[in-house]
Amino acid sequence: MFSSPLLLTTALCATGVLSHSPNSYHFDPLRHLAGVAPPFDPIDPPLDPAPPQGCNVTRAAYLVRHAAIFANDFDYETYIEPFTDKLKNTTVDWTKVPVLSFLATWQDPITDAEQEMLTRSGKLQATKLGVDIAQRYQSLRTPKKIWTSTAERTVKSAKSLTHGLADDESDISVVQIQEGEEDGANSLTPYKSCPAYSSSAGSDQSSEFLEVYTKPALGRFNAAAPAFNFTATDIYGMSLICGYETVIRGSSPFCNLELLTPNEWLGFEYANDIQYHYNTGIRIEKLNE
């Protein structure tokens, strides 16, 4: 058998793009956005990926997520779109609300058609990951196949990966695996392989904390712009936009620390922790008992 990296793709994430000096720490909301945070290496300096002295890599397998998308459909339809629709219909003069004055000219970076689609930066992430893998395992043969689920964002991530992995991407076949109930190949999307899984698990617990951590921000915003009637889900949607817009446009005015405090960003992060703790973490068994 020859040595070759086996690449299993449900979605791709790239190596870190955010960093800070340990001697000049500055709170960065982009590091506290849970699943919508742009990729970064949490360890400074990053760990050396080389094997221990005296060891050699003879085979490598990668199971990775898709690269950056415009927006998760649930996030967009539940939080972002209701907030942006509310913005379109409001009569508030944002130029008279200092911390929110950018809303007078701000435009939504996401459309309905772009939901779940791969962004340009996402394609770059996937390509860079391919380059990183090729350079890291130069002694291994380039794989002939990459397996992917059939979601468009995943297929495009896999194809972008081949651009960086091989000198000629046509040397690698991107194989789409059907995941229907009759096909049985559902390991690339774990929740489809577990009949007991519930996508709503954790929502109640997370929503309860959402009402708690957003209270200070609601007090400030509704005092500044009472006609808009900010809600807890508006605050959550603004935090989501910070991450998604940064990936799409390179930056976002919603990431401003004058808009939300570090504690409020940490509240957003913890609300997501609660959601996933009960949804796919160790507490899932307790909910199913």
Kindly label every feature range from the protein language model.
Residues 1-21:
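Fungal secretory targeting signals
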Residues 20-142, 152-289:
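Signature for phosphate-centric chemistry
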Residues 145-149:
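Short glycine-rich or small-residue beta-strand-to-loop segments that form or flank ligand, phosphate
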